[in-house]
């Protein structure tokens, strides 16, 4: 990690009435870092993501992306810029389109101002489509979906659809991706594929990641640093080894 963090969040607070879901949490993600965010159910992880990505406005605190204060920006505004993207626990794909078409559409949504500017008539439009297809094919290989690239997304497994979603988020060349439980509901073999895809994207493109994940083996495997939340507050922060052997974390999250 060098220079300013790609994401720097300070004193974040979000309350719903008398319930404080996130209480004065500060966190940073370094450039090129894979950082984990864990905690028991109800610890504030998803609310923290929502505040960081503009889905929910925090009551207090600041969010800086690449050194720019984006506190209070809407989810759409942040997404349109393409520098920081997030996944949701519910996977969404274009079921009738094949894998490659899903990625091309995703790339168009971020890269060009209107659908018909990409899929129009003329040499410029053809060049844009060709560039998107080239990028899509590179990412399909990274996601391990090459053999099924021409199959409708709706015919593939839930794990494969998560890989489509992951590859789609890489289309606009983001600097940071926030993943919300990317391993949930997929079989062990595909978990290995998702882990490898995250690693490849990080190594090849320098994408930084902040990952919410309940699979502790995955988090300790791919993350250089882990932040633990409990009851809306930061409980601990450290290397995977430090977190696994932290007694307070074991009591709150790992079952003692």
What do the predicted segments below correspond to?
Residues 116-148, 189, 196-199:
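Conserved ABC ATPase "signature" region
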Residues 53:
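Helix-to-loop junction immediately C-terminal to a conserved catalytic motif
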Residues 57, 69-85, 89-91, 125-133, ...:
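ABC ATPase NBD coupling module
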Residues 177-181:
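Catalytic Walker B motif of ABC-type/P-loop ATPase nucleotide-binding domains
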Residues 38-40:
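The feature captures the beta-strand-to-loop junction immediately N-terminal to the Walker
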